[in-house]
């Protein structure tokens, strides 16, 4: 049972509780069943459940580490993409003219840039804390919001450039 408990703690440290919850939960349940059998003095069953718990915990640690690496990669990619989109938005905002650029930049785009800068910092902080799933989701949302703001800012400009129909 001690080996099973140690394997479960290792799995939790590897992120299995977040990234491989089914396998991790099965390991914990098997350990509980092992303890239950030991209190009933059925030591053979207790040993079987403890061995099962250890194997499940090792599988959970392996799966959790793999999934965590995948989500970390997705989060880092999403943050890079959002940062690039933010740079595009900032360039568009500056291209509205160096003098009084803030006055000429549409308010929704300006607001989206300001919020994206704050949210992007939060996504980077989440990655530093190893909270990869929220970081990935936040970065994807930032990217979409900024893209929508860029599109909205360009629509009036596109309409203004058209000639009236005769």
Where does each model-flagged region fall?
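Long, charged/polar, soluble alpha-helical segments
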Residues: 1-166
